[in-house]
Curated annotation (Swiss-Prot):
Its cofactor is Mg(2+); Mn(2+). Residues 583-660 form the BRCT domain. InterPro entries: BRCT_dom, BRCT_dom_sf, DNA_ligase, DNAligase_adenylation, DNAligase_N, Hlx-hairpin-Hlx_DNA-bd_motif, NA-bd_OB-fold, NAD_DNA_ligase_OB. It catalyses: NAD(+) + (deoxyribonucleotide)n-3'-hydroxyl + 5'-phospho-(deoxyribonucleotide)m = (deoxyribonucleotide)n+m + AMP + beta-nicotinamide D-nucleotide. This is DNA ligase. CDD domains: BRCT_DNA_ligase_like, LIGANc. PROSITE patterns: BRCT (PS50172). The active site is at K112 (n6-amp-lysine intermediate). Its EC number is 6.5.1.2. It comes from the Bacteria. DNA ligase that catalyzes the formation of phosphodiester linkages between 5'-phosphoryl and 3'-hydroxyl groups in double-stranded DNA using NAD as a coenzyme and as the energy source for the reaction. It is essential for DNA replication and repair of damaged DNA. NAD(+) binds at D33, F34, V35, Y36, D37, S82, L83, E110, R133, E167, K281, K305. It comes from Borrelia garinii subsp. bavariensis (strain ATCC BAA-2496 / DSM 23469 / PBi). Keywords: DNA damage, DNA repair, DNA replication, Ligase, Magnesium, Manganese, Metal-binding, NAD, Zinc.
Length: 660
């Protein structure tokens, strides 16, 4: 066990050193800060439990170095430390709570600029030198390059000796403009700013629009007592400071501090520069000295960092996927990138029209996001590295049938298409539908390829004992598959109706049908025999549109679909589902909800199911058409978006009565 732990520590140290070089020296990081920080935390945890394996070269005792060989190394007059950081607001609040302000609350909050750290040295009011942070003890002398930044005064009105800390950055607009002309584009504005600053020829640097904010005094010659006085002094001396820095005193509360952080978080995409969090600092310098320092960071400051909402990557290939409805969806295979807490290697391109609108082809560098914090999508082309635009093929990749365009999408219209068939079976077995345990995509694909099944009906006629002769299918697994199939026969009618795959008929629409007394196969079948009457009846239900109405009518007049229903009825499936309809249910019927956060004593899935049973419609993301957002503790980015769109907010107390 000890050897295994020692090896993990060594592996972590090696990996972190590699990432340090990529970030600080090459300006080409391969992982997001969130991933890096999690590895640092893991290393700290192991070293804390096993101090016998902690060595002096551990990254937990140091921070990364940006020292380069082609610049002179100069010693800093004071240690240039890093910042401690958290990704959780509760941990940030805990840090504030632990500080003894002695009844004199004083905190400053400012955006954490995602740029390149710099230290400026003034002698008698004249800029003497500018050093990168380096390894905290030594930095590279980039004075000539820094002198080209017009926001840095070369001479001050006062003859003072100063050591100042700032952040060199480049605006979002200039990042996109410059990146288009670079042979090897940068993945972030921070990396571009860092790369420009490290150019050997200062004449080249002068051609780029670098910017800077100064945010700290590192020497005490001016005898300033608080951070607000220090920032005011910086302004007076002619330095550019972030206008969004705000100071909170004894008249303020932690709630006001957290509200301001929420405000910055909400508005960050509108800022002209990239930020990756906010920085909180104790304002009183006497208290700062009392709180002290570690070898890594001051104890009087804390960075609250955001998880990345988007990232940049290169498109390596584009594959065309065929869905259960025959819809063709192009998907980009991209270099691995970390966005919103997950690694992404594939991102949807929606359809051919979308590809044309962004001018995308294989080889281009793109911006990737996770829409609704779930579905990865390509947002735009950052750098056009290839000629032309990708074209979806004319024929289905699975059955070679000529594709037909309906609206913005291409479809394979072949009902016997193998890709369509296998996707329908996967959908039927999926968790949201019949939830047939053990039938993974891999298992279903195996059964389909061996021609044991060709439709969902075959799941109930196939002799699963035939699988015993195949590798990976032992007695217990086969027995579990059979039991899962039997258990699925007891599922409610709403699940069967969803699983059968009527085009665009989802859980919410089914719930609306049931609330309007269309809660059985026989009722729906009888209604749809008179197409005109069925159409007008369905359109009277709020939330049922023309497309869904026509698809329902078509399905209940289609012989293949009706034969499926008849098959399941003969097997003993439930073909009717009772639902309690009262005045309370009607208040929620058809209303569109979304949910975020955690709820004491209730999982989100339970809340969703209970409200769905009363007619509520649940959406996965916040949009303009949403009626309500239910907000629990630790609410995410959905709350920010809902406030921007003026969506009504409901607390747990507001919905509690509906959960009984």
């Amino acid at each position: 066990m000890s050897i295994k732990i020692q090896q993990e520590i060594e592996d972590l140290k090696k990996l972190i050193r590699k990432w340090d070089k990529e970030y600080y020296v090459d300006s080409l990081p391969s992982v997001e800060d969130f991933v890096y920080d999690n590895h640092i935390l893991r290393l700290k945890e192991l070293e804390s439990r096993h101090p016998e394996y902690k060595t002096l070269d551990s990254p937990t005792l140091k921070f990364g170095s940006d020292l380069l060989n082609n610049f002179e190394e100069v010693e800093h007059s004071v240690p240039i430390l890093s910042l401690d950081k958290v990704y959780d607001l509760d941990l940030l609040k805990s840090w504030i709570d632990k500080i003894d302000f002695n009844n004199s609350f004083n905190i400053s909050v400012e955006p954490k600029i995602d740029g390149c750290s710099i230290v400026l040295y003034y002698k008698d009011g004249i800029l003497e030198k500018a050093l990168t942070r380096g390894n905290g003890k030594f930095g590279n002398d980039v004075t000539k390059n820094i002198r080209t930044i017009r926001h840095i005064p070369l001479f001050l009105d006062e003859k003072v000796d100063l050591v100042l800390r700032g952040e060199v950055y480049i605006t979002k607009e200039n990042f996109f403009k410059i990146n288009k002309f670079l042979e090897k584009p940068y993945t972030s504005s921070r990396n571009l700013a860092s790369g420009i600053l490290r150019r050997v020829d200062s004449r080249e640097v002068a051609n780029f629009p670098l910017n800077i904010f100064i945010y700290d005094f590192l020497n005490a010659e001016l005898e300033l007592k608080t951070n607000d006085l220090a920032i005011a002094k910086l302004k007076k001396l002619g330095f550019k400071v972030d206008p969004l820095i705000r100071f909170f005193d004894q008249k303020s509360s932690i709630i006001e501090v957290l509200n301001y952080i929420a405000d910055i978080t909400k508005k960050r995409n509108s800022f002209e520069y990239e930020i990756d969090g906010v920085v909180l600092k104790v304002s009183e310098f006497v208290l700062r000295e009392k709180l002290g320092y570690t070898s890594h960071h001051p104890k009087w400051a804390m960075a609250y960092k955001f998880e990345a909402l988007s990232g940049f990557s290169r498109v390596n290939s584009i594959v065309v996927q065929v869905g259960r409805s025959g819809k063709i969806t192009p998907v980009a295979n991209i270099d691995k990138v970390f966005v919103s807490g997950a690694f992404i290697t594939n991102a949807t391109l929606h359809n051919q029209d979308y590809i044309i609108s962004i001018g995308l082809n294989v080889g281009d560098v793109v911006k990737v996001s996770r829409r609704g914090d779930v579905i990865p999508a390509v947002e735009m082309v950052i750098n056009k590295c290839s000629k032309g635009v990708f074209k979806v093929p004319d024929n289905c990749p699975a059955c070679k049938t000529v594709l037909v365009k309906e609206g913005a999408h291409f479809f394979c219209t072949n009902n016997s298409c193998p890709s369509v068939a296998v996707e329908r079976i996967k959908y039927f077995c999926s968790k949201n539908c019949m939830d047939i345990e053990g039938f993974s995509d891999k298992t279903i694909s195996f059964l389909f390829e061996k021609e044991f099944i060709s439709s969902e009906i075959d799941l109930y006629t196939f002799n699963f004992y035939k699988l015993l002769k195949f590798k990976g299918f032992k007695d217990r697994k086969v027995y579990n598959l059979i039991n899962s199939i039997e258990a699925s026969k007891k599922k409610p009618f709403s699940k069967l109706l969803l699983s059968i795959g009527i085009k665009e008929l989802g859980e919410n629409a089914i719930r609306l049908l049931f609330l309007n007394n269309l809660n059985s196969f026989s009722k729906l079948f009888r209604l749809c025999q008179d197409r005109n009457f069925a159409f007008s009846t369905l359109l009277k239900i709020k939330g049922i549109g023309e497309k869904i109405a026509l698809n329902i009518i078509e399905a209940f007049n289609d012989s293949t679909m009706l034969n499926k229903f008849k098959f399941f009825e003969n097997l003993g499936f439930k073909m009717e589902e009772s639902i309690l309809i009262d005045d309370e249910n009607r208040l929620l019927a058809g209303k569109k909800f979304c949910i975020t956060g955690t709820f004491n004593g209730y999982s989100r899935s339970i809340i969703i199911d209970k409200l769905k049973n009363k007619g509520a419609i649940f959406k996965t993301c916040v949009t303009e058409g949403l009626d309500f957002l239910i907000v629990g503790e630790k609410a995410g980015s959905k709350l920010e978006k809902a406030l921007n769109l003026n969506v009504k907010i409901m607390s747990f107390e507001d919905i509690k009565s509906y959960l009984n």
